[in-house]
Amino acid sequence: MALSSTEVNRIRNFCIIAHIDHGKSTLADRLLEITHTLDRTQMASAQVLDDMDLERERGITIKSHAIQMKYRASDGLEYTLNLIDTPGHVDFSYEVSRSLAACEGALLIVDATQGVEAQTIANLYLALDAGLDIIPVINKIDLPSSDVEGVARQVMDLIGIKREEILQVSAKAGIGVPELIEAIVQRIPAPADNNHLPLRALIFDSVFDSYRGAVIYLRIVEGSLKKGDRVKFFASNKIFFAEEIGTMSMKRQPKSLLESGDVGYLICSIKDVKDAKVGDTVTLADNPAHERLSGYKEVKPMVFSGLYPINSNEFEDLRESLEKLALNDASLLYTPETSVALGFGFRCGFLGLLHMEIIQERLEREYGVNIITTVPNVEYRVVMTNGEVVIVDNPSKMPDTGRINLVEEPYVTMQIITLADYIGNIMKLGMERRGEYKNTDYLDTTRVIMHFEFPLAEIVFDFHDRLKSISKGYASMDYEYIGYRDSDLVKLDVLLNGETVDALSIVVHRSKAYDWGKKLCLKLKGIIPKQMYEVAIQAAIGSKVISRETISAMRKNVLAKCYGGDISRKRKLLEKQKEGKKRMKQVGRVEVPQEAFLALLNIDE
C-alpha cells in the first residue's frame, strides 16, 4: 500500500549536531522517553544510542544510528520522527555529511556552560551545505555556571537568527524537551513526495551482523523499495536480493515496503561491508535510476601506523581481530608488514587520530590483543628524479635521498576556538608545528576563532594534548584536509652500533631533524639497558650522522684477584678483557626494549 502525500507530510527526518560532551546522547534519551519509544525502566543505562562501552566512556558517538519514534502532536495528528544520530568528531566528517544528507532538519545543541565550540561550527557548516533547517538549542540551562544569554548571542551571531527562535532545555532534567519536540514537528519540513520516480536510496551507515551479513541503514530519497526486490549498488555495480527491509525503533521492525521519505534498513546477505559504502546509492536492478545521488566519495585514510603484537605468537589473533573490526568499519585499511626489530605486524590506515585511538583501544579491550604501535605518520608523495611518483606511507620505505626530486606532504586548514587570553600560547604552538597563521575572528568579547594551515604530520602526534594543556582545557580544534604541498622533508634513521632499526625511522622537516635526533638519542640512552660492550646510538640522515650518544659497557673488575704484584700482569688481564668485548661487539645484537618504541610517542616528556 502506497503512502499518501498526507502521510509523507507527517514524517520528520532530523539529526542532532553538537560538540563532544554537549549533551547530544542525553537529549536523544529524553526524546525516546517522551515519545514512549522507551520508558525509564527500560533505560538501564544512559545514552541508549551509544551502545559501545567506549562510546559511553569517552562521551562520544562513533557510529551513526537511526531510530524511529511516533509522536502525537498538539494538533492531534500522529507524526513519525526519524532521529539519525551522527558522530561528532572531525575524523568522521564524511559519515556526518552523509547522515545529514538523509535529513531535512538538524538540532544544533550548544552547552550553556561552554558556548560554541570548534566541532559545533564544523558540523553546522556541513548542515548548512546540505540545505538543512536548523533549530538552535541551548542545553544544560539548569547548571549554576550556565550563561544562557551570552551563549544565545554567540549562536545569533553564528547563524543570524532571532533570539526567540533559540530553544532552551535541560536534557538531563527534561526541562523544555516537550516544547522542543513540538518545534521539530512545526519547523522541520516534511520530505518531498517522490514515490513516482525510480528508486534512489542513500546509504548513511552499515553494521555487520554475524548471522545476516551487512545491515544497511538507508534513507529512501525517491521511489519505493519492496521486500524481495533485486537491488543494485552504484559504487560496486553488484546486484543483491532484498531479503528483509524495515524501520529501526529500538529493535529492527520488518516491513514489506519502504517509500520516499522513509528511513530504514536493508538486509541482503552482503558478506562484506565494503560492498555497502557510506554515501553510495541503492537502486532497483530491474528499473534503475540513471545516476547516483550527489556527494559520494571514496573515504581515504589520512594517518598510518604499524601495529605489532607484543608476543609474536599472537600475530594470527591480531589478524583475526582486525578482520572482525574491518567488518564493521569500512574505512579501516590494513596490510601485513614485517620489521626487523618488531617482527610480523600490520600497517594500518585510519581516518584520523581519534579513529586510530579507538581501533587500538578496541583491539586491546574487546579482543584482548596486546600491541605495540609505531609512531603515527601520514602518506607522502615522492617525485623521483626520473619523474616517477611514489606514495610512501611507511618511513622505512622512503627512497634514498639521491633519487628524490621533491617530497610532498598533506596539509590541513584548522580552526581553533579559544579564550582570547590564550592567543599568545596558541600562536607559539602554531609556529613550533610549522603552522601558517591566517586570521582571527572574535565570537564575542572573550572567545576567538583562530585560522591556521598546518602540515598534517605536525598535528597527528600530540597536538591536541598540547593545545588542551596550554589553554587549560578551553581550546577546541577542528581541521579539514586541503591537499598536498612540497616540503623539505628528510628521513631520520636510528642506528645502534651501526645497524639501522627500521621501526624507529621517521620522516621530519629538515629544520627539525637535528633537534629531534638529539632528543631521540638521549631518550634511547636512558631506556636501552647496558650491555657487556659499548653501544653507540646514532641519528643519521642518509649517511650523515647528526647526533650520537654512547651507552658505556658494564665492566667487571678483572683486577679484583690481583692484590699487588706486577703491573704487566694487570695490563695483560685488561687487554684480554678488551679483546673479549671487541669480539662480543662484533657478534652481539642490541635488544631494543618495547619502551623504546613508546618513547617516540612522547619524545618531549
Curated annotation (Swiss-Prot):
Entry binding sites for GTP: D21, H22, G23, K24, S25, T26, N139, K140, I141, D142
Catalytic activity: GTP + H2O = GDP + phosphate + H(+)
Enzyme class of the recorded protein, top EC level: hydrolase
GO biological process: positive regulation of translation
Pfam families the UniProt entry points to: EFG_C, GTP_EFTU, GTP_EFTU_D2, LepA_C
CDD domains listed in its UniProt record: EF4_II (cd03699), EF4_III (cd16260), LepA (cd01890), lepA_C (cd03709)
InterPro entries with a match to the protein in the record: EF-4, EFG_III/V, EFG_V-like, EFTu-like_2, LepA_C_sf, LepA_CTD, LepA_IV, P-loop_NTPase
Signal sequence residues: none
Compartments, record wording: Cell inner membrane
Statement: the UniProt record of this protein carries the keyword Hydrolase: yes
PROSITE patterns: G_TR_2
Membrane association type: Peripheral membrane protein
GO molecular function: GTP binding; GTPase activity; ribosome binding; translation elongation factor activity
Keywords: Cell inner membrane, Cell membrane, GTP-binding, Hydrolase, Membrane, Nucleotide-binding, Protein biosynthesis
Enzyme Commission code: 3.6.5.n1
Highest taxon of source: Bacteria
Any one annotated GO CC term: plasma membrane
Cell inner membrane listed as a keyword: yes
Domain (tr-type G): residue spans on this chain: 9-192
Role played: Required for accurate and efficient protein synthesis under certain stress conditions. May act as a fidelity factor of the translation reaction, by catalyzing a one-codon backward translocation of tRNAs on improperly translocated ribosomes. Back-translocation proceeds from a post-translocation (POST) complex to a pre-translocation (PRE) complex, thus giving elongation factor G a second chance to translocate the tRNAs correctly. Binds to ribosomes in a GTP-dependent manner.
Family: Belongs to the TRAFAC class translation factor GTPase superfamily. Classic translation factor GTPase family. LepA subfamily.
Name of the protein described by the UniProt record: Elongation factor 4
